[in-house]
Amino acid sequence: MESIGVLMMCPMSSYLENELEKRFNLLRFWTSPEKSVLLETHRNSIRAVVGNASAGADAQLISDLPNLEIVSSFSVGLDKIDLGKCKEKGIRVTNTPDVLTEDVADLAIGLILALLRRLCECDRYVRSGKWKQGEFQLTTKFSGKSVGIIGLGRIGTAIAKRAEAFSCPINYYSRTIKPDVAYKYYPTVVDLAQNSDILVVACPLTEQTRHIVDRQVMDALGAKGVLINIGRGPHVDEQELIKALTEGRLGGAALDVFEQEPHVPEELFGLENVVLLPHVGSGTVETRNAMADLVVGNLEAHFSGKSLLTPVV
């Protein structure tokens, strides 16, 4: 397989790079100063693309690579891959489901606690020496708060199970009712927000879910409600979020993802009722290595004529 060209779109994992380089002719797209020259030079040898939540395979890239056979995503999300174009050209697509579910769900609960109990502020309070001047202000309890989840898939379900351990009633919105769960279903996101103290975004990003959390949803969540986003940045209308937070119409927000990563609206930096993370939902050594193994395993299976491990297309 050493002659098979694999185009890696951006830095993802040194472990993944090493494993790919052992097996294939690895081409690093981000290191090339002349990307068009790289594609023209290797267009016939590139048979696989490895992308992630930041960079995948759009229609133009797919058209530029006539011998492309498979796109393997180092992510569970597929919003950076033109799935329609892949289906049209018979290109296989894989992702990394399941292995990152637990980490992302853990982080969602961590964000809830960090926001409600103001853990980041508490840390700064101690470091700055302010504790000597007086006690920190009282915060908000998590246990018993109603948690609304947008998207009750693998990750959403894992978040729900964790929140249940905090005696939280669980509500959800999904494309369809889940008959095998006891959680309360709401037919619209606005209805869900109106009946939840904490709203968690955990659905895939599609054209239908882009800005699924808009001004109407934020107003329904209200001045005591908080928003947690561990999905994708474009799920939330960031400009409306900034307005809702600064105007006091929304109680707080904890965000692991943003609309234009790695660029974060500076208006959020000065707000005390927000927690901001650099898209680290699956960012543990164990999970990233497991994701890398899935990417490599899918490529090896494809080029060996075997069944894909996690096929999407």
UniProtKB/Swiss-Prot annotation:
Disulfide bonds: none annotated. It catalyses: glycolate + NADP(+) = glyoxylate + NADPH + H(+); (R)-glycerate + NAD(+) = 3-hydroxypyruvate + NADH + H(+); (R)-glycerate + NADP(+) = 3-hydroxypyruvate + NADPH + H(+). Homodimer. GO terms for cellular component: cytoplasm; mitochondrion. Disruption phenotype: Elevated levels of hydroxypyruvate and other metabolites in leaves. Under long-day conditions, slightly altered photosynthetic gas exchange. When associated with HPR1 disruption, strong air-sensitivity and dramatic reduction in photosynthetic performance. InterPro entries: D-isomer_2-hydroxyacid_DH, D-isomer_2_OHA_DH_cat_dom, D-isomer_DH_CS1, D-isomer_DH_NAD-bd, NAD(P)-bd_dom_sf. The keyword NAD applies. Pfam families: 2-Hacid_dh (PF00389), 2-Hacid_dh_C (PF02826). It is found in: Cytoplasm. Belongs to the D-isomer specific 2-hydroxyacid dehydrogenase family. GyaR subfamily. Its EC number is 1.1.1.79, 1.1.1.81. Its main location: cytoplasm. The active site is at residues 232, 261, 279. Keywords: Cytoplasm, Glycolate pathway, NAD, NADP, Oxidoreductase, Photorespiration, Pyruvate. Strongly inhibited by oxalate. Catalyzes the NADPH-dependent reduction of glyoxylate and hydroxypyruvate (HP) into glycolate and glycerate in the cytoplasm, thus providing a cytosolic bypass to the photorespiratory core cycle. Mostly active in the presence of NADPH and hydroxypyruvate. GO terms for biological process: oxidative photosynthetic carbon pathway. GO terms for molecular function: glyoxylate reductase (NADPH) activity; hydroxyphenylpyruvate reductase activity; hydroxypyruvate reductase (NADH) activity; hydroxypyruvate reductase (NADPH) activity; hydroxypyruvate reductase [NAD(P)H] activity; NAD binding; salicylic acid binding. This is Glyoxylate/hydroxypyruvate reductase A HPR2. It comes from the Eukaryota.
